[in-house]
Amino acid sequence: MTTATETKTMPRLKERYRNEIVGQLREQYQYGNPMQVPGLVKIVVNMGVGEAARDAKLIDGAVRDLATITGQKPQVRRATKSIAQFKLREGMPIGAKVTLRGDRMWEFLDRLLSIALPRIRDFRGLDGRKLDGNGNYTFGLTEQSVFHEIDQDKIDRQRGMDITVVTTATTDDEGRALLKFLGFPFKEN
């Protein structure tokens, strides 16, 4: 019987964060304690499918796309209350979301920054002013085809998604600095 020793490799971006970025942030903000340095908590990828209220099969495509992009099974989000104007009933599926933590989060962020964002047509950078006041950043993508995991021929319809990066930063300035060091391509105002 042989014992296979599996060596887990640390994600590239996580290694860069620990070895370089923490030191740069400590130097820039004069943190006394290394635990004060802001870091990433989780990334939430949300895909709203409002048309699923009329055609329930549309949610399956969104779930399949999110699972392919993130490598994790999405949670189907259902309507919490009925709204007659939208022909929406309580309990109908209206979206899907995935919460990424740990190594999956770092690997997704690496793929997003190095492969997906550069593939966007006419991309001039992300808006650096859209932080929420606590150092968390949310932005939207208009189509799922920028991710190379999605097969262009199997796309049934174009779907956008919201991506929220939750950090431990206490201010927008700290959060922006962390994201800039991680490689987020912010527009120069």
From Swiss-Prot:
One Gene Ontology cellular component annotation held by this UniProt entry: ribosome
Keywords (A to Z) from UniProt: Ribonucleoprotein, Ribosomal protein, RNA-binding, rRNA-binding, tRNA-binding
An example molecular function term from Gene Ontology annotations: structural constituent of ribosome
Keyword Membrane: no
GO BP annotations listed: translation
Similarity comment text for this entry: Belongs to the universal ribosomal protein uL5 family.
Function: This is one of the proteins that bind and probably mediate the attachment of the 5S RNA into the large ribosomal subunit, where it forms part of the central protuberance. In the 70S ribosome it contacts protein S13 of the 30S subunit (bridge B1b), connecting the 2 subunits; this bridge is implicated in subunit movement. Contacts the P site tRNA; the 5S rRNA and some of its associated proteins might help stabilize positioning of ribosome-bound tRNAs.
Quaternary organization: Part of the 50S ribosomal subunit; part of the 5S rRNA/L5/L18/L25 subcomplex. Contacts the 5S rRNA and the P site tRNA. Forms a bridge to the 30S subunit in the 70S ribosome.
Protein name: Large ribosomal subunit protein uL5
Taxon lineage: Bacteria, Bacillati, Actinomycetota, Actinomycetes, Micromonosporales
Name of the coding gene: rplE
